[in-house]
Amino acid sequence: MKKGFTLIEMLVVIGIIAVLMGTGAGAYSGIVKAAEKKRCQELVADTATALTALYQKNGAWPKALRRGNATDVELDKDAALPLAKAGYMSLSMNDGKLSGYDRFGIVSPWGAAHIKKRGAAASLSDKIGSRSLQDHILHCALDLDGDGIIEGALVGGESVDIRATAAVWCCGKDGVIERYSTGLKKDDAYSWSYGQTQGVK
């Protein structure tokens, strides 16, 4: 009676291990993507909550947030500053300006990771994949007339009415803010639910 494995038996075992590793790698990739999307979702929800609290406290929107008709405002260093000053978001400040990792405003988790990696050398024109750091700044729309409805929020160029005081959205890892109707199925994150856009009059 022989002891040990034959070459065929070893190849079968190696093949089984390879299949299991391939399956595990695919599952791991899905878990990582879901975790990234969840972090982004939490960021937009927290930012919308902070904006709503700021409005409720002051009874009006700060001038830095009332750009144009406030249907697509970048939460850049100027627009994010009122949130930092009011203490609603823990953003780094120095001499009344955003500083450190927060010096560009509120950015996606991928933008934040890039800024931390590059440190002081980071700039808005830096590439993250095929897009720039500028593309990773969060966007918001505001209810300017106080009726609880944001009329005509421009989400990826698509006009959307939303039942909310403040709505915040963010691109996915690709740096592209999709049209709202297609972004729901992709990697973009929104502070509101689909139901908040239905039957708005």
Regions found by a protein language model. Name each.
Residues M1-I31, E36:
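N-terminal single-pass transmembrane signal-anchor helix
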Residues K2, K57, P109, L144-G146, ...:
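Short, ordered coil/turn segments that flank beta-strands lining enzyme active or ligand-binding pockets
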Residues L20, G30-T49, Y55-W61, L65:
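Extracellular/surface-associated beta-sandwich interaction domains
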Residues K37-K38, A45, T49-T52, S125-K201:
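Short, surface-exposed interaction loops/tails
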Residues C40, A84-G87, T165-A166:
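Extended low-polarity, hydrophobic cluster-rich segments
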Residues L51-W110, L124:
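Short, glycine/small-hydrophobic-rich surface segments
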Residues S108, A112-A113, G119, S132:
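Glycine-rich, aromatic-lined ligand/substrate-binding cores of catalytic
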